[in-house]
Amino acid sequence: NITDEGLKYLSGIHTLNLCSNKNITNEGLKYLSGIHTLYLNWNQNITNEGLKYLSGIHTLYLNCNKKITDEGLKYLSGIHTLNLSCNKNITDEGLKYLSGIHTLDL
C-alpha cells in the first residue's frame, strides 16, 4: 500500500484512486491539492482535519469514511463534484456547508 511519504511524488496526477488504503493519513493529503479527481473511499485514517487540504480538488469521492462528520464539510465548499454516500456521521446540519457544490451524492 501507498503511504503518506509516497504521495508527495504524485502532484502532477490528474486522477488518483486511493480507496481502502490503510496507510494514508491526514498528513499525506496535503500533497494532493492539485489533483483533479481523487477517490478516498473506505480510508479509515482520514478525518475532518485532513479535509482542509482538499479544497482545490474538482471531484472528490469520500464514500464510507467513518471519521468524516458535519464539521469537516466546511472545508469542501469549493469542490465541484462530491460523493459522501454511506457516511453515517453526515447529517442535515452539515449540508449548510455544501450549497456551492455542483453535483452531490449523499
Where are these regions (language model features)?
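Concave beta-strand-loop units of leucine-rich repeat
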Residues: 1-2, 12-24, 34-46, 56-68, ...
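The feature encodes a structural signal of leucine-rich repeats
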Residues: 4-8, 26-30, 48-52, 69-74, ...
